[in-house]
Amino acid sequence: MSDYLKASEEKMQKSLSVLKNELAAIRAGRANPALLDRIMVDYYGTPTPLNRLATITAPEPRVLVVQPWDVSKISDIEKAIQKSDLGINPVSDGKVLRLVFPELTEERRKELVKLVHKKAEEAKVAVRQIRRDANDAVKKMEKNGEISEDERKKREEEIQKLTDKYIKEIDKVVEAKEKEIMEI
């Protein structure tokens, strides 16, 4: 694989990775321990990520259980969760916290699907821009006499195949996320 194609593929792969990360942050019907990754707990005066202070599990699709390693800090963990933007009120039994996430409404699911499609379109635009840049570079090489017209056409076809591959990948990722969101 030539340098221009390798560079284009790396950029397209990066666009796909960004999309996957953005979609992972969108909550589908299931409670995911990663939802608590951003929560910081005051641990002896030091803000500490919750996942470094407790075991977080998802025993049921809409329930997370937070089991602190230091049970004396359960009230601090509870306060940190209440202050977060999750809008969830933890239930404590003194040893563990249970977080019950409400069922997503049909309307909210549709909003999330729209958001997924918007993010996908942004990724596709980025991939197409990479294709445009690569094609411009190839045309410039032809203009400077570095490659022939036939070579330019061949390279443009390779770039187009690569673009098509990544657009299909984006569509697959979006389809899977949409299915996950609409699943009840």
Swiss-Prot record:
Which GO biological process entries does UniProt record here? translational termination
Might you report a single GO cellular component term? Answer: cytoplasm
Q: Which SUPFAM superfamilies does its entry note?
A: Ribosome recycling factor, RRF
The record's annotation in Gene3D superfamilies points to: 3.30.1360.40, Ribosome-recycling factor
Its subcellular locations are:
Cytoplasm
Q: Which Pfam families match?
A: RRF
Q: Which InterPro entries match?
A: Ribosome_recyc_fac, Ribosome_recyc_fac_dom, RRF_sf
Q: Which GO terms describe its molecular function?
A: ribosomal large subunit binding
Question: Which keywords does this chain's UniProt record carry?
Answer: Cytoplasm, Protein biosynthesis
User: What exactly does this protein do?
Assistant: Responsible for the release of ribosomes from messenger RNA at the termination of protein biosynthesis. May increase the efficiency of translation by recycling ribosomes from one round of translation to another.
In which family does this protein belong, per the annotation?
Answer: Belongs to the RRF family.
What is the protein named?
A: Ribosome-recycling factor
- Origin species, per record, is Thermoanaerobacter pseudethanolicus (strain ATCC 33223 / 39E)
Protein encoded by which gene: frr
